[in-house]
Amino acid sequence: MSETAPVAAPAVSAPGAKAAGKKPKKAAGGSKARKPAGPSVTELITKAVAASKERKGLSLAALKKALAAGGYDVEKNNSRIKLGLKSLVGKGTLVQTKGTGASGSFKLNKKPGETKEKATKKKPAAKPKKPAAKKPASAAKKPKKAAAVKKSPKKAKKPAAAATKKAAKSPKKAAKAGRPKKAAKSPAKAKAVKPKAAKPKAAKPKAAKAKKAAPKKK
């Protein structure tokens, strides 16, 4: 009886090990099924824009219709479509003719290589400008100091000009001071004339005295 018991124990453990070995295989198969078999969003967008014959470009609404007709779920992947459009415009594969951001009309860039070359040419040209801008800034500070030195003689000239203005004003004051003297002389002359007119009045009483003396002789 003791020999049959240990033989049954290994028989039970063996199927458990086999089941554990089969589980990772199923998981591997599930991961393979999650990978998208169809083309990416950017590829679908480029195909739809290339198929359109509109001169002004394909609008966002027309692009969604074209993607929906191809079996793509537009409602669930709306954000992906917008991100795909922005990335394609940034790369230079698409050109935005109207609107801003993901909204508007889009066309295929016929010369994508030229846009990339222009972008690469502009970047190195911007780097040497930074050290060149610093040098004139230091040189510009020196002429400011020289300008401050030049301003000091201007201040010295201002008091000289003020002195000339005061000297010019002083004869006017002297002329004004001379005018009241003439006015003061004129009333003095008028006073001298008045006593002359009073003399004939004093002569009248003398004539009256002469008349009174005449009857005494009779």
Curated annotation (Swiss-Prot):
It is found in: Nucleus; Chromosome. One of its GO terms (cellular component) is nucleosome. Residues 119-133, 141-158, 166-184, 191-218 have a biased composition (Basic residues). Residues 37-110 form the H15 domain. Keywords: Acetylation, Chromosome, DNA-binding, Nucleus. One of its GO terms (molecular function) is DNA binding. InterPro entries: H1/H5, Histone_H1/H5_H15, WH-like_DNA-bd_sf, WH_DNA-bd_sf. Its main location: nucleus. The modification N-acetylserine is found at S2. Residues 1-41, 89-218 are annotated as: Disordered. One of its GO terms (biological process) is nucleosome assembly. Pfam families: Linker_histone. Residues 1-19, 27-39 have a biased composition (Low complexity). Belongs to the histone H1/H5 family. Histones H1 are necessary for the condensation of nucleosome chains into higher-order structures. This is Histone H1.
